[in-house]
Amino acid sequence: MKGEFLTARDIQKILGVKQAKSYDIIRTLNAQMKEEGYMVIQGKVSRAKFEECYCYKGPKSQTG
């Protein structure tokens, strides 16, 4: 999961959703990006767009 793009499997692991839901998320985010004028890759979504929309920043530290 270190690349610029996330797959349905990556989204399943991050959000704990089923495969169908993860593909729905990808379709929704890619549609938004198309409206903004970006080129998209079917079946993958920009990690930056996903993090922007889902406020996901990875595991939080247990210290502090």
Curated annotation (Swiss-Prot):
Induction: Constitutively expressed at very low levels. Induced in response to overproduction of RapI or treatment with DNA-damaging agent mitomycin C (MMC). Keywords: DNA integration, DNA recombination, DNA-binding. GO terms for biological process: DNA integration; DNA recombination. GO terms for molecular function: DNA binding. NCBIfam families: ICEBs1XisBacil. Required for the excision of the integrative and conjugative element ICEBs1. Excision of ICEBs1 requires two sites, attL and attR, at the left and right ends of the integrated ICEBs1. This is ICEBs1 excisionase. It comes from Bacillus subtilis (strain 168). The gene is xis.
